[in-house]
């Protein structure tokens, strides 16, 4: 397996939001992704790309400790958020997930009204402000207010797939995170809905740091400032493939002037 990855030397002027430091994630005895170093800048969109099974979603879930919910999953190395170790014993994973929200691959509205989809999480997190204002602001930020302002009492499941995904984004925004993780948020959507999500991402990065996993390389080009390319290779004695970070750089450099041949091969469609 390729043991090294390529990225620009750390820029002291970059405000690092999340720092992944020599992270290896295992399921039982199997190492799913190994030795990942990556500094995610604040206020930008970072895309994770790579073929299936390369560990990009595993790393994404580690950023807000969603992997804690998978039996047998363990982390070696460190993941720092604002300089603090997310996996330190005193850290509450529930609070981590509030500050680092997640939007999943399949839209998953709560079985509640559109209004309550937004208000529910804020309420249980102790929000004491104007709930109507919070609901409207969150729906506006997710670019769905105009489409649902007259049916807030209707079920979230009555919306189209693309609208449901934007509702889920609004639900995430409502608990006021600092980072939003998106795991293939457009994979189940049609091109028009995908475009709306991408336009929403461009607006959201004004207020949030965003990390998105995508198989759609053109989507990575359209929405991201930085791109991390992951790959996977078989290891002697292992039944599966181990993922690793090949290269992390400005999106323009990854797609137009990559420093690694594997990156060039992937972004040019030679494998994947």
From Swiss-Prot:
Pfam families named in the record: ABC_tran
Gene Ontology terms for molecular function: ATP binding; ATP hydrolysis activity; ATPase-coupled phosphate ion transmembrane transporter activity
Keyword Transmembrane in record: no
GO cellular component: plasma membrane
Limits of the ABC transporter domain: 18-257
Keyword tRNA processing: no
Localization per Swiss-Prot or TrEMBL: Cell inner membrane
SMART domains: AAA
InterPro entries from the UniProt entry: AAA+_ATPase, ABC_transporter-like_ATP-bd, ABC_transporter-like_CS, P-loop_NTPase, PstB-like
Function text: Part of the ABC transporter complex PstSACB involved in phosphate import. Responsible for energy coupling to the transport system.
Protein's name in the database: Phosphate import ATP-binding protein PstB
